[in-house]
Amino acid sequence: MKIGIIGAMEPEVVHLVQAIVDPVHTTIAGIEFISGSIAGKDVVVTRSGIGKVAASIATTLLIEKFAATHVINTGSAGGFVDSLAIGDIVISSEVRHHDVDVTAFGYEIGQMAQQPAAFMPDSTLVNAAKSAVAELGEVKAIEGLICTGDSFICDPVRTKVMRENFPTMAACEMEGAAIAQVCHQFNVPFVVIRSLSDNANNDSPVDFDSYIIKAGMHSAMMVIALLQQL
């Protein structure tokens, strides 16, 4: 088992990089990959950059160049569940695009043509994440739908539409569904684990800048605890 771990931004991967034993650095297409081990597991950690295209490139390289057999996406997200606070965690029960619309051809809202409507995470990784929750102290974690789009969501009008389209959505972010789609194409197991940095509202730009470090630390703690369960 070799586990590829992807975060979009430096605060989302810095704690994981610091935890790597015997790190080896490789740069491809301007993306740095750090190989080594965490909790005795072979890992490759990368900061992909923000958005679906960047995440897709990094995921493909992890699988093709570094032979990742499993992929974990970690980082921050905007929350859509009132019971969760900033810093709490959502473990993907499924992952969908929220900004895709080819319904004119009979697809569901959010479903890319010739792709499943939802990408389902690997049960072993999800169960390991659920078992790891006990290691997080007072940080709350739930399973839920995570939706992805190439926009930072802070507009109440957009938020309202997203809630109508995806009433069970727990969190939104900008990479997870792209990573999940690449993993689906390559038949590689994945899970998305996100810590809330904001609540997808008018305050989100300020909240994100204030809490991205906290969210990154919590999601990294979750990933390390997950690796210890495997």
Swiss-Prot record:
Group of enzyme by EC: hydrolase
Disulfide linkage: none
Keyword vocabulary terms for this entry: Amino-acid biosynthesis, Hydrolase, Methionine biosynthesis
Coiled-coil stretches: none
UniProt keyword Metal-binding, yes or no: no
Signal peptide span: none
Keyword Glycosyltransferase included in the entry's annotation: no
Top-level taxon: Bacteria
Pathway(s) of this molecule: Amino-acid biosynthesis; L-methionine biosynthesis via salvage pathway; S-methyl-5-thio-alpha-D-ribose 1-phosphate from S-methyl-5'-thioadenosine (hydrolase route): step 1/2
Functional note: Catalyzes the irreversible cleavage of the glycosidic bond in both 5'-methylthioadenosine (MTA) and S-adenosylhomocysteine (SAH/AdoHcy) to adenine and the corresponding thioribose, 5'-methylthioribose and S-ribosylhomocysteine, respectively. Also cleaves 5'-deoxyadenosine, a toxic by-product of radical S-adenosylmethionine (SAM) enzymes, into 5-deoxyribose and adenine.
Protein's name in the database: 5'-methylthioadenosine/S-adenosylhomocysteine nucleosidase
Organism annotation: Shewanella frigidimarina (strain NCIMB 400)
Lineage: Bacteria, Pseudomonadati, Pseudomonadota, Gammaproteobacteria, Alteromonadales
